Amino acid sequence: MAAAAGVSGAASLSPLLSVLLGLLLLFAPHGGSGLHTKGALPLDTVTFYKVIPKSKFVLVKFDTQYPYGEKQDEFKRLAENSASSEELLVAEVGISDYGDKLNMELSEKYKLDKESYPVFYLFRDGDLENPVLYNGAVKVGAIQRWLKGQGVYLGMPGCLPAYDALAGEFIKASSIEARQAILKQGQDGLLSVKETEKKWASQYLKIMGKILDQGEDFPASEMARIGKLIENKMSDSKKEELQKSLNILTAFRKKEAEKEEL
């Protein structure tokens, strides 16, 4: 009788255990597969529609239910680094086309192809219908530079907030005289820049001068040139220097140009 009762009790508990195990799998760290990534908010078909409309910028990664590998490692770093931005929320949606078909509604809404996972969309000002697709390499630096080009402020290595703002004003200025005045403002500001930051502040000024001499296409062509250089074998310190130069150049790219590339 006791044995029978034990079997009966175990049988009655099994549905509950199944639910608990499912929840544990869903929110387990990536080592055991699941959707919990430090710095990223996991969303589903319910929370997605609650979170996006209330946020200025949300970068959402749509991926398999249990992602892993190099691209996922890059995403983990990106999510952790997002703490530097007060206006950006990083989120992820896990999708499964079998079993319970987890979040397939969102996959269909945004016409996602599982062969292309991970897919990144930037949602702006709560707009659920017109997110911006990211088409670049799944690398932390590349995604950060793209986000910066979309108007998301990120405290990226090498970048100085005051000179980022000047770069934005410089690009928006419609006359040579106005741009020359902004360049002069930046030159005067060097006196108050920390010694450790003067090298990078000077880079902003150098780029402004190059744009005045060579035209609007300079930032894009210089980014392409440095991007190719980084692919070559070099010391970590040299690569870090070039990455900082790329980060600074991003401040001079127009949002319209970013949209056209997509």
UniProtKB/Swiss-Prot annotation:
Q: Where is this motif: Prevents secretion from ER?
A: 259-262
Cellular component terms (Gene Ontology)? cell surface; endoplasmic reticulum; endoplasmic reticulum lumen; melanosome; smooth endoplasmic reticulum
Task: Could you list this entry's UniProt keywords, alphabetically sorted.
Answer: Endoplasmic reticulum, Phosphoprotein, Signal
Q: Which GO terms describe its biological process?
A: endoplasmic reticulum to Golgi vesicle-mediated transport; negative regulation of gene expression; negative regulation of protein secretion; positive regulation of gene expression; positive regulation of MAPK cascade; protein secretion; regulation of endoplasmic reticulum stress-induced intrinsic apoptotic signaling pathway
Q: Does the keyword Lipid biosynthesis apply?
A: no
Q: Where in the cell is it found?
A: Endoplasmic reticulum lumen; Melanosome
Q: Which residues form the signal peptide?
A: 1-34
Q: Which InterPro entries does this entry report, sorted A to Z?
A: ERp29, ERp29_C, ERp29_C_sf, ERp29_N, Thioredoxin-like_sf
Q: Which domain of life is it from?
A: Eukaryota
Supply the Pfam families for this chain: ERp29, ERp29_N
- Positions bearing Phosphotyrosine: 66, 68
Q: Which GO terms describe its molecular function?
A: protein homodimerization activity; protein-folding chaperone binding
Cross-referenced PANTHER family: ENDOPLASMIC RETICULUM PROTEIN ERP29, ENDOPLASMIC RETICULUM RESIDENT PROTEIN 29
What quaternary arrangement does the UniProt entry report? Homodimer. Part of a large chaperone multiprotein complex comprising CABP1, DNAJB11, HSP90B1, HSPA5, HYOU, PDIA2, PDIA4, PPIB, SDF2L1, UGGT1 and very small amounts of ERP29, but not, or at very low levels, CALR nor CANX.
Question: What role is this protein assigned?
Answer: Does not seem to be a disulfide isomerase. Plays an important role in the processing of secretory proteins within the endoplasmic reticulum (ER), possibly by participating in the folding of proteins in the ER.
Question: What is the protein's name according to its record?
Answer: Endoplasmic reticulum resident protein 29
Q: What is the originating organism of this protein? A: Mus musculus
Q: What is the lineage of its organism?
A: Eukaryota, Metazoa, Chordata, Craniata, Vertebrata
